[in-house]
Amino acid sequence: LILMNSYLGLDGDIPIQDQKGEYIWVKESADSTARLYTIGEASYAYVIVIQAGAIAAVIILYWKTILQIALGCIGKSPSGRKLAINLICAFLPAAAIGLLLNDLIEAKLGDDINAVAGALVIGALVMLLVERWRKNNKKISVKSDMSTNLDDLTVCQSVMIGFFQCIAMWPGTSRSMATIVGGYIAGLSPKHAAEFSFLLGLVTLSAASGYKIVSDGENMIKALEIRPILLGCLVAFISALLAVKWFVNYLSKNGLELFAWYRIVLAIAVVLLLGK
């Protein structure tokens, strides 16, 4: 459980398989009507809800930036207001497409090991290609220079990063990988691409966690009890707190290659260990 929660806190690429054959009865309303609620449904909700721990870690690590965003929302920081608008614009594609397609994608591909392994390999190749392009050309945006500050990001670039985040709906695709690659293509430096990715994750995961707490919170607690949920949040918080700052520093100096090769190794392991 602790290892799984650590992966989730790091926005890992390992998918959690639903246990669709196990069911429990849960009360749906005051009239004692009940419906079947699978352990798989509870586990899926759990995976999303414990991201509250990772959210808390990002808030602590980026509290100054978040404070500027808050000041911007009340008209006291122009740069904070611009960043808030960009984050909202980047969030909207995933919010809209997620509501329309997430359940369909999960139903069709959630248990498909080949789809997961393929996404791991394709994602790795994209990371290697984009990283080589960045290093060889010193720029990958249509602008003549690389953005050096999140203040330089435009609404159009933010929306583009938001569409990259939608790619993470495909099982085996990392949300952070997709948005960092999107940030590269938008012209951000590795450091600022990672920072924007984490801030966007704060918005996206907060919305997803809040939605699952409202829609599935009571049933999830009945299925899994409260202690594993609290433990999951704590472990996700600690692992994210330890990893995020290291990740940003490493990415600034070395780029994405290491994580691309990790995905390839992981894809091989997934096929060998879980393939049929």
Regions found by a protein language model. Give the residues of each.
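Multi-pass membrane proteins that catalyze or facilitate reactions on polyprenyl-/lipid-phosphate substrates
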Residues: L1-K276
